[in-house]
Amino acid sequence: MTRHCLVSSLLLTLLLALPPVTHAEDWVASIDESQGLPQLTRGGNLAMQAKFKFFAADWKWANFDSGAFKVEAPFTYSLRARNSTLGFDLKAQIAKTTEQSLTWAFDLQAHSRKTNVMGGGISFQFDRALFTEMGKPNLLPGNRGWSWGDRAKGPYIEMRFDPPLTSVYIEPIDDAEVRAFFYKDQIAPGTQQIKGVLTVSQGIELAQTSDERFGLGDTSRWPLDQTDWRTSPVDLSFLNAGEKPAGKRGFVKAVGDQLQFADGTPARFWGTNVSAYALFKTSDDEIRAQAKRLSALGFNLVRLHHHDSYWVTPSIFGRHDQVRDTQNLSPESLQKIDWWIKCLKDEGIYVWLDLHVQRALMARDKIRGFDELPKREGLTDRDKQPIADLKGYNYVNDTIAQTMKHFAEQYLGHVNPYTSLAYKDDPAIAAVLITNENDLTGHYGNALLPDKTPTQHIKRYMALAEAFAKQHGLAKEQTWRAWEHGPSKLFLNDLEQRFDQQMIDHLRALGVKVPIVTTSTWGRNGLSALPALTSGDLIDVHSYGGAGQLEKNPLTSDNLVNWLAAAQVVGRPLSVTEWNNEWQSDTQPVADRYTLALYVAATARYQGWDALMHYAYSQEPFREEDRSASNWHAYNDPSQLATLPAAALVYRRGDVREAGQSYVFAPTSDTLFNQSISPADSVLLRTAMEKGKLQIALPKTPALPWLQASALPAAAKVIQDPNQSLLPANASEARSDTGELRRNWQQGLYTIDTPLTQAAIGWLGGKTLALGDIQLKLKTASASVAVQSLDGKPLKQSRNLLISLGTRAEPQPNKRTPFRVEPLDGTLSIQAVDGLKLFSRNAQGQLQEYPVSYQDGRYLIRFDGRQMTNWLFLK
């Protein structure tokens, strides 16, 4: 799929010849291709983002119903959009007019008079965290725009409109938003032309769009992906050969900050999620085939997720519109879970079970206060009664807790006829999660606040808050305010822990032997969410990120792995049940998603994390007719799949050494609970993990007698200031203390250089990169290239090498597959023993020879920019 099919061949030649762009400055202004409007980043994170916003009467949304942004030439763009509700069309010509300015020539054509409308135009949203440094945005006189920063000192940015607009104002309830309205109160028929000029100071770079950086080739000409979704293009099943069946070493247990099997063998898990419809609508034969494929791809853990979710039909309860309650499990659905467990177990793959994800309660579940619970719009049970969400409310409603316990009894006590074991008695079950993404400390405490219609749940919450405040001498009016730091974070942790401990005690009484996880820290939770999680045996975390994760400057900006690292509590194993990119939209994947797997795997091994699960392998059934493109379907996405096996090798085999130095952030109780501390606002959390292993020490806290103070590791460097940076102020890259990992955020480049794995990831085009035994010279702007030994010998001695190649891949219209895959252009040189041959796999999965030359002890592989394979085998 391409938005540039009309670009002339002459222009294409010019653009493709341009060197790939990496950013020379920390501050970067560019055009957001989804809007055709300016955006400003600082260290890779958004500092200002602009969006069109229009409103009909009474602030009812009336945004564009169609639009198209196009790159006409380098730094020259056009934009067209239609607003049917308000009856006007918008066109814009956009260009870089000086080295420090971008200009928009807006042409608005209103077709009829509209009255009694709020109007609209452009909303500029600023990062409030930068107000300390930049100040708040200022309005230019006479409705002409706004400025931000200090013109004399810089950085400084200004957006000026001519002629003046109908209204430019700072949103009264959000001083981080400036609204610049083209129309206000009414729309008169006719044309108006408006010039907008974005001017930036020295030190702010005007950069190309994402598409320009990648190159504006016609993606419809890319070759179609040839990967078979039923078989694996590589075979790493040897990693599981000694573990069949899963559970042979006994139950998994948490020992200090590590996972072990019962026989004392260390346990590390590289996993994924099989979710929703994939669980219940896949045939038994295909489940067996996918279990074998998962093993061949290098996985040894699968989380069975969204088994109970309201939007999945059937779920573990059956079809929600055909049942009257959720007190009984569907025999047909249980059979599918049984078979998944059996097939995965046979392949040496362990299983992670969730007890609650998005279960919807029903009227006949006999929940006290059911009428008060938020309902799932448009969804009903068999009696046509609405169904309700339980998140947050389970902490203050014992009838919800009781029904969750009842589910656990049925689910974990169910005897799998294929294994003759109840789930609770099966050592192939690695861990159990009580409730998914359901914390009070950062999210669902807000559901219980008294600004809602008074209910028995809110009254219960307020009574508990008052009692906690009285018991511990805290300010009553501060203790219930869930959105604030201070006494509320103490109370919310305590309330969450009470429920967690009750559930843990119940599960242990049922006979659950494996580690129990309460819920996850997720959704930009701060460190004050961690204490309640220590009730469980593991700390679990979720993290998702957008494009350009390698370009995030840790001195100023957070990326996906920073949030994972900030959950590592001293003395506790760390699991990651969800990590991934986020698609830019429902139909547009993140272009550089091929960079993520190796980055996460190498970081995880360096940090010493214990279990990682990519989200997700699939949410759709494994059927020929269901093969769609999605962020949640790695199984058929060549851009994700390309490097997942390589990442499995890095992590499971220990190709990357663990950090030699530990850095422990040890906040006092006052620091932890009375202020926001997270990767978003702590430079220590971001920079420490670049230098060594990051751990969080939790303090003794009188109001939380159940919270055990962390025992500080003997050789760790202990730091108490969250604002202390461990990198120089002008740093542009960091190397691990082992010397094996290097990230240059200015160049958007990450390398792994070890005896068994050598990889280069990110903006590789136009550079010559040399690692221990490989040399890479690509014309393709961005890619991931990994060379790995499969026989356990160092690369230069190995006689069996895997080469993994990741590039962009785009789905066909309407999210159809197969994807079109960007062909690699350039050369790869590998120092290795003589006598090896190079192979690729054809569409039938058969090996076929691939051209390669050998001279002076090196193999030279040429990529022609026309054909593409994601895996090569030198053996």
Question: What feature does the model see in each segment?
Answer:
Residues 107-174:
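Polysaccharide-binding surfaces and accessory modules of carbohydrate-active proteins
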Residues 8-19:
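Bacterial N-terminal signal peptides
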Residues 251-256, 260-262, 266-536:
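Active-site mouth of glycoside hydrolases
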Residues 499-516, 528-724:
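Catalytic-core region of carbohydrate-active enzymes that cleave or remodel glycosidic bonds
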Residues 787, 857-875:
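C-terminal beta-strand-rich structural cap/linker in extracellular carbohydrate-active enzymes
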